[in-house]
């Protein structure tokens, strides 16, 4: 079929297999161009491996370090009449490239929050991998089913304490309006922590430790975004911020529970990028449009793959990692530089519907958003008839 983007609000409901493959290939080539990472991991588990920072982590582990990788994700394959999800096509492209490069790689599609996923992953690790020396936890999910009680928790994106009003860009109509987000209830905060906090990260590490599949000195990392003044009320001082604070708690708990194996657990603070998760957050499309304009102008703009290569070389596998006082790796330092933030704040005050395309980089934002789903990628023929049903071998 000929596949053109179908966008509804902040979601694109289809994906292009060849565009997704080209994106993955570009990230692989960027990583290879950086050269081999010294003292990198050998056996890596990536929980949430199909898009964004999780996918980039897996690419750096495999193509930057030569590691075996086991990737978990929750994606839909294509059929003859319907496209699969972008994440499915990303993993299929990664798998093909890994095989071509002679890298061991296996994939699991399912609910990473379940006990079943954990035991299945452990079986694969025991049978085929050797002990794990890096666990990447990179899940972005709106819901989580408690594996014991069966209760389903849902996350919300709301400020904490008081309502928050800010300008917001409707990415369909290009209208800029004031949007008010009501404050979250205690119950909504608790549910968001259950979904997006550190509990499942702990459960993964406990299950892996109990099965004795973690190497001595294994590292584990989970990702967060903190942001600055503009995004703080909807990120840092909001339900999502409360959940991310719980990641800090979990990191400390993991390191202390498994100290006999010298396990290190850190949260890594990464920069704002366009992902399927961030495009759903009010304020972020407009903030990102301003941020890209400023960072591109001063030559510091980075996407997921640039960020992850730096996380590995400057933090995870560095003798002098960049840590803050909460023991978090920081790779957001370019975004948070006073110069960049001042530039973004100035633009934020000036942006209107009339000058949006002129003074911000909304076009760049849009291009990145469509690119997530494999559209608008250089070198891809979008008039070509393509098969949406792409093969990918999965762990049964």
Swiss-Prot record:
Record function comment: Involved in the final reduction of the elongation cycle of fatty acid synthesis (FAS II). Catalyzes the reduction of a carbon-carbon double bond in an enoyl moiety that is covalently linked to an acyl carrier protein (ACP).
Pfam families per UniProt: Eno-Rase_FAD_bd, Eno-Rase_NADH_b, Enoyl_reductase
Protein's pathway: Lipid metabolism; fatty acid biosynthesis
Top-level taxonomic group: Bacteria
Catalyzed chemical reaction(s): a 2,3-saturated acyl-[ACP] + NAD(+) = a (2E)-enoyl-[ACP] + NADH + H(+)
UniProt GO molecular function: enoyl-[acyl-carrier-protein] reductase (NADH) activity; NAD binding; trans-2-enoyl-CoA reductase (NADH) activity
Keyword Coiled coil recorded: no
Transmembrane segments: none
Sites where the protein binds substrate: 225
Disulfide bonds: none
NCBIfam families reported for this sequence: EnoyACPredFabV, PRK13656.1
Entry keyword annotation includes Cytoplasm: no
Subunit structure: Monomer.
EC number: 1.3.1.9
Region forming the signal peptide: none
One GO term of the biological process aspect: fatty acid biosynthetic process
Family, as annotated: Belongs to the TER reductase family.
Binding-site residues, NAD(+): 48-53, 74-75, 111-112, 139-140, 244, 273-275
Site label Plays an important role in discriminating NADH against NADPH, positions: 75
Protein name: Enoyl-[acyl-carrier-protein] reductase [NADH]
Residue positions of the active site: 235
Key words, A-Z: Fatty acid biosynthesis, Fatty acid metabolism, Lipid biosynthesis, Lipid metabolism, NAD, Oxidoreductase
């Amino acid at each position: 079929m000929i596949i053109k983007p179908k966008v509804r609000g902040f979601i694109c409901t289809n994906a292009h297999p060849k565009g997704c493959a080209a994106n993955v290939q570009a990230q692989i080539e960027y990583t290879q161009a950086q050269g081999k990472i010294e003292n990198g991991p050998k056996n890596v588990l990536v929980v949430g491996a199909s898009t964004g920072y999780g996918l980039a982590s897996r690419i750096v582990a495999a193509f930057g370090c030569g590691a075996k990788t086991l990737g978990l994700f929750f994606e839909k394959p294509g059929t003859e009449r319907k496209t699969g999800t972008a994440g499915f096509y990303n993993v299929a492209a990664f798998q093909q490239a890994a095989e071509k490069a002679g890298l061991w790689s296996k994939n699991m599609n399912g609910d990473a929050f379940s006990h079943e996923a954990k035991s299945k992953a452990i079986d694969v690790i025991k049978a085929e991998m050797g002990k794990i020396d890096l666990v990447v936890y990179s899940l972005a999910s709106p819901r989580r089913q408690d594996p014991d009680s069966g209760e389903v928790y849902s996350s919300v994106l709301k400020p904490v304490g008081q309502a928050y009003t800010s300008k917001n860009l409707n990415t369909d109509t290009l209208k800029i309006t004031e949007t008010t987000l009501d404050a979250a209830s205690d119950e909504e905060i608790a549910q968001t922590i259950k979904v997006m906090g550190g509990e499942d990260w702990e459960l993964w590490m406990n299950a892996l430790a109990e099965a004795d599949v973690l190497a001595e000195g294994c590292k584990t990392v989970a990702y967060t975004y903190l942001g600055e003044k503009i995004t703080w009320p909807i990120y840092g001082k909001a339900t999502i911020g409360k959940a991310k604070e719980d990641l800090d708690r979990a990191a400390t708990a993991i390191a202390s529970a498994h100290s006999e194996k010298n396990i290190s657990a850190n949260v890594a603070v990464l920069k704002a990028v366009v992902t399927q998760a961030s495009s759903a957050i009010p304020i972020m499309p407009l903030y990102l449009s301003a941020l890209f304009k400023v960072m591109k102008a001063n030559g510091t703009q980075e996407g997921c793959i640039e960020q992850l290569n730096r996380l590995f070389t400057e933090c995870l596998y560095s003798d002098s990692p960049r840590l803050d006082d909460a023991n978090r790796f920081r790779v957001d330092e370019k975004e948070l530089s006073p110069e960049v933030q001042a530039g973004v704040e100035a633009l934020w005050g000036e942006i209107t519907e009339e000058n949006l395309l002129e003074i911000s980089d909304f076009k760049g934002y849009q291009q990145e958003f469509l690119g997530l789903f494999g559209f608008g990628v250089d070198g891809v023929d979008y008039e070509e008839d393509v098969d949406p049903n792409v093969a990918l071998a999965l762990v049964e």
